């Protein structure tokens, strides 16, 4: 894996110098970040805003288009309605790029709003850079030319997760516990479909949906899981909804496995602590011990903010924008969207591709397990002494899933 991470900041700096004659050099590209800075999910939002601002600095120093990046944070309170107000505020400031990721219900509202705006306002188009909203519909039935997803969607993550689970004969009874909105529904749907195809002998012994970012005590859910006899829980929960779930599991003495998407996200490492050793798994497009430039960035981020960097899609976004703007020789969203469409470029996990068919980034995925940090895997999130150790890598061709998207490019 280390050999694949061949790109460095000095190389990118050379690229900047080589393109200094281009028209867009020195332009400031503003990105409106629309995500929660209040409520139960505020710690996640705060971490991700810092991540965007940190990498705006890094990529302003060195990107092949020679542009300056600036991130403007707007609190959406995890609300679709507030997000539409935030979008209008961004447009009023002349911002042409937006990013969001926490809550697929929010992302869906933004996709619709961006589509309508771009159709009605030629010459003032906006691009939606989706960093973390993973509902597969956004690159299938609801796909949009103006929407680009840099995370891996639920169908991709569940394809990889269940490929691993298929070989584990000790997994016999599974409980599905998810948040009651589109993301949670899709996690449950794809878990059932994949397990039925790959391991029809596995029993789904229980299924629950709970309100997003409202539950403060998951003990009743843990009691139901224990009573069901489940040896494994699959959950797409994130933020406080995962941190409080694993805390309740530790306190309630549940010793089964958890297969998650977001163990590394703010609050969950602390909630797990020494508990869950060898039993809590995460499927993601990055992990804490990737080495190379990523390790240097993580160390600098931790030193500056006393916090952990875990949203690698931020890097995908800035790397992709830099290459697309260099290719387009412009910061105009219409030209940049055309350049991003099908773009192959280098990011922290090697070559990635923004698939033309649906604007879903094709990238490797990593299955990791919560365990004690060691010399080979030294990074310890939230100073727990624990880490997410890589178990299996799924290259892009394995994690890739088909799409039903009928992409409509603008006239």
Positions of PLM-derived features:
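Beta-alpha junction/loop-to-helix N-cap segments that form part of ligand/metal-binding clefts
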Residues: 28, 43-47, 58, 62-138, ...
């Amino acid at each position: 894996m280390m050999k694949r991470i061949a790109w460095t900041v000095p190389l990118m700096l050379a690229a900047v110098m080589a393109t200094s004659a281009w028209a867009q050099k020195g332009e400031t590209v503003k990105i409106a970040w629309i995500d929660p800075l209040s409520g139960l999910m505020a710690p996640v939002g705060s971490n991700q805003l810092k991540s965007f601002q940190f990498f705006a600095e890094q990529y302003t120093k060195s990107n092949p288009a020679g542009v300056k990046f600036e991130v403007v944070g707007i609190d959406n309170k995890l609300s679709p309605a507030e997000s539409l107000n935030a979008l209008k505020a961004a447009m009023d400031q002349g911002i042409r790029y937006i990013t969001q990721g926490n809550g697929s219900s929010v992302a869906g509202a933004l996709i619709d709003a961006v589509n309508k705006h771009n159709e009605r306002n030629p010459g003032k188009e906006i691009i939606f850079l989706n960093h973390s909203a993973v509902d597969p519909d956004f690159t299938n039935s609801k796909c949009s030319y103006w929407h680009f997803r840099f995370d891996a969607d639920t169908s991709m993550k569940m394809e990889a997760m269940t490929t691993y689970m298929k070989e584990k004969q000790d997994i016999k009874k599974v409980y599905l516990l998810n948040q009651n909105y589109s993301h949670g529904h899709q996690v449950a749907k794809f878990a059932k479909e994949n397990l039925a195809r790959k391991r029809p002998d596995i029993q789904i012994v229980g299924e629950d949906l709970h309100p997003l970012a409202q539950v403060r005590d998951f003990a009743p859910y843990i009691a139901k899981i224990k009573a069901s006899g489940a040896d494994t829980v699959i959950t797409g929960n994130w933020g406080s909804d995962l941190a409080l779930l694993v805390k309740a599991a530790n306190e309630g003495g549940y010793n089964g496995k958890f297969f998650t998407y977001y163990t590394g996200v703010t609050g969950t490492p602390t909630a797990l602590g020494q508990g869950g050793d060898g039993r809590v798994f995460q499927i993601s497009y990055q992990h804490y011990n990737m080495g190379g430039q990523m390790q240097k960035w993580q160390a600098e981020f931790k030193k500056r903010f006393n916090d952990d960097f875990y949203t690698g899609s931020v890097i995908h976004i800035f790397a992709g924008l830099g290459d697309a703007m260099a290719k387009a020789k412009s910061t105009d969203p219409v030209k940049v969207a055309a350049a991003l469409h099908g773009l192959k470029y280098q990011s922290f996990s090697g070559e990635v591709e923004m698939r033309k068919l649906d604007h879903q980034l094709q990238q490797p995925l990593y299955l990791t397990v919560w365990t004690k940090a060691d010399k080979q895997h030294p990074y310890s999130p939230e100073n727990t002494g624990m880490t997410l150790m890589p178990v299996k890598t799924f290259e892009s061709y394995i994690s890739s899933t088909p799409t039903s998207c009928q992409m409509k490019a603008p006239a």
